[in-house]
């Protein structure tokens, strides 16, 4: 074992974490950025929370890193309580050791299956955070029901992004009841949100995303639960279908059914709230969280100001129109000079969000080459 620091928290973790070994406690240091962002986003949500008690659940605890950081780092004037569960007895033991290490008394630990723990706490938690290895689908129904408090928050990670991005089409249809589309990674999180919205609607619950990102090998979203059939209907109205036009390489929305060449349903509404993003960014900066977390939040802050599903990949576009790829910064400047909004995206170094049309980009790139060569 070794002791490390994440954010403002000390953690005892295994020297090596190997999933193939039976009874091994899993800790993933690569996900520190994920946890930095998560604490920042939940803090932003908590800043507007009006009740005296705030109850959270991390039902897939592992080493306890996520739940313990919530318990230790979230600032709240009322009573903050965190429930952490894991089916692995070695994980439960490590979580308890980490509680002692941080001198925390506001955490309850459960040696229990995640679905059992959530089902026992129907409508109890203000926040449920599903962070599994793989797909969140097996835990989603019980996670939704456990977070049905008024204005609850459901956080969800999927590490099966190859499935969500279309590499395994049949698996995606089977697990998410949706047809994936290869290409833009943002569509992975939009497909995941779309599935969650459909799941919640059967309980007359609407889900409203307030923050989403696609980083490394995972997609992640935070959704507020809103009660009532009307709220569920409003959420469903944001579902739609997308077709990647083989001639123009553009995305087009389609609202009715599966037709040849169309994929979905995807959530086509806003997936990150501008105020939540900005407040999360300020929290991450004030607490000196990892530079990478801050960089991602800064990019999402800019992205969230432009209403566009997905992005334009400049490499892909130039390949299609048979032009050399100009410096991305030059294209951005040209767009701004022509009155368009534009931002880089956090998940693709060659991706741009803009209110310009595809035809505008083609013209600007062609003009750039005519002036340069």
UniProtKB/Swiss-Prot annotation:
EC identifiers of the protein: 2.1.1.216
Keyword RNA-binding listed: yes
InterPro entries referenced in this protein's UniProt entry, alphabetically: SAM-dependent_MTases_sf, Trm1, TRM1_arc_bac, tRNA_met_Trm1_C
Binding site for S-adenosyl-L-methionine: 35, 66, 86, 113-114
SUPFAM superfamilies: S-adenosyl-L-methionine-dependent methyltransferases (SSF53335)
Reaction catalysed by this enzyme: guanosine(26) in tRNA + 2 S-adenosyl-L-methionine = N(2)-dimethylguanosine(26) in tRNA + 2 S-adenosyl-L-homocysteine + 2 H(+)
GO molecular function: tRNA (guanine(26)-N2)-dimethyltransferase activity; tRNA binding
Trm1 methyltransferase domain residues: 2-365
Keyword Methyltransferase appears in the UniProt entry: yes
A biological process from GO: tRNA N2-guanine methylation
HAMAP family: tRNA_dimethyltr_TRM1 (MF_00290)
Role this protein plays: Dimethylates a single guanine residue at position 26 of a number of tRNAs using S-adenosyl-L-methionine as donor of the methyl groups.
Protein name, as recorded: tRNA (guanine(26)-N(2))-dimethyltransferase
Organism annotation: Methanococcus maripaludis (strain C7 / ATCC BAA-1331)
Organism placement in taxonomy: Archaea, Methanobacteriati, Methanobacteriota, Methanomada group, Methanococci
């Amino acid at each position: 074992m070794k002791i490390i620091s994440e954010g403002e928290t000390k953690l005892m973790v295994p020297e090596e974490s190997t999933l193939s070994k039976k009874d091994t406690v899993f800790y993933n240091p690569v996900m520190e950025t994920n946890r930095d962002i998560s604490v920042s986003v939940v803090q932003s949500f908590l800043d507007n929370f009006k009740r005296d008690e705030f109850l959270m659940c991390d039902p897939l605890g592992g080493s306890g890193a996520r739940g313990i950081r919530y318990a230790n780092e979230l600032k709240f004037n009322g009573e903050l309580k965190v429930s952490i569960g894991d089916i692995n007895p070695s994980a439960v033991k490590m979580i308890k050791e980490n509680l002692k290490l941080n001198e925390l008394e506001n955490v309850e630990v459960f040696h229990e299956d995640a679905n059992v723990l959530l089902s026992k706490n129907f409508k109890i938690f203000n926040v449920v955070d599903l962070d599994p290895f793989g797909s969140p689908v097996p835990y989603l129904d019980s996670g939704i029901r456990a977070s049905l408090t008024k204005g609850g928050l459901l956080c969800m990670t999927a590490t099966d992004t190859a499935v969500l991005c279309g590499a395994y089409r049949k698996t995606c249809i089977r697990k998410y009841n949706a047809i994936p589309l290869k290409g833009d990674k943002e569509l992975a999180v939009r497909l995941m949100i779309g599935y969650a919205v459909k799941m919640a609607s059967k309980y007359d619950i609407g889900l409203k995303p307030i923050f989403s990102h696609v980083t490394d090998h995972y997609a992640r979203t935070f959704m507020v639960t809103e009660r009532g059939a009307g709220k569920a209907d409003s959420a469903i109205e944001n579902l739609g279908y997308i077709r990647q036009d083989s001639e123009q390489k553009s995305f087009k929305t389609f609202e009715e059914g599966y037709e040849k060449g169309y994929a979905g349903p995807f959530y086509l509404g806003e997936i990150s709230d501008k105020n939540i993003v900005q407040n999360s960014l300020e929290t991450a900066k004030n607490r000196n969280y990892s530079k990478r977390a801050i960089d991602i939040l800064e990019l999402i802050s800019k992205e969230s100001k432009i209403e566009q599903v997905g992005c334009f990949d400049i490499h892909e576009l130039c390949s299609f129109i048979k032009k050399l790829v100009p410096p991305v910064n030059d294209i951005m400047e040209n767009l701004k000079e022509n009155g368009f909004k534009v931002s880089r995206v956090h998940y693709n170094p060659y991706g741009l969000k803009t209110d310009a049309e595809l035809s505008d980009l083609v013209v600007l790139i062609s003009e750039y080459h005519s002036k340069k060569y």
